[in-house]
Amino acid sequence: MRHRKAYRKLSKPTPQRKALLKALLISLFKHGKIVTTLPRAKEVTRIAEKLLTIAKEDSVHHRRLVYAWLQDRELVRKVFVDIAPKYKDRNGGYTRILKLGMRRGDAAEQAVIELV
């Protein structure tokens, strides 16, 4: 049974899963919107919400926490200077998931994640 499991495994070993989520996060913050499968979208949303909540308060410690996921100084600067200030008065709900339907090749459910 799947009771009290903290996250989705996405049918990948841990290092592969972390690399996938990191790549999706980087794309989300660079482009503001990405298309992926629904389970991946839900996992990326969880992490993106946490990172944006951290980024709302600018400090060296918070920048290091965000850098641990993004690994790109310019992108961290963009998150703290451009993206996070837009959400200063918002308590969560920084991302939106829109379902796109099934992918033609393998019938996987597609979704768009975008920053609100």
UniProtKB/Swiss-Prot annotation:
It comes from the Bacteria. One of its GO terms (cellular component) is cytosolic large ribosomal subunit. Keywords: Ribonucleoprotein, Ribosomal protein. The lineage of its organism: Bacteria, Pseudomonadati, Dictyoglomota, Dictyoglomia, Dictyoglomales. One of its GO terms (molecular function) is structural constituent of ribosome. Belongs to the bacterial ribosomal protein bL17 family. It comes from Dictyoglomus thermophilum (strain ATCC 35947 / DSM 3960 / H-6-12). NCBIfam families: L17. Part of the 50S ribosomal subunit. Contacts protein L32. One of its GO terms (biological process) is translation. The gene is rplQ. The keyword Ribosomal protein applies. This is Large ribosomal subunit protein bL17.
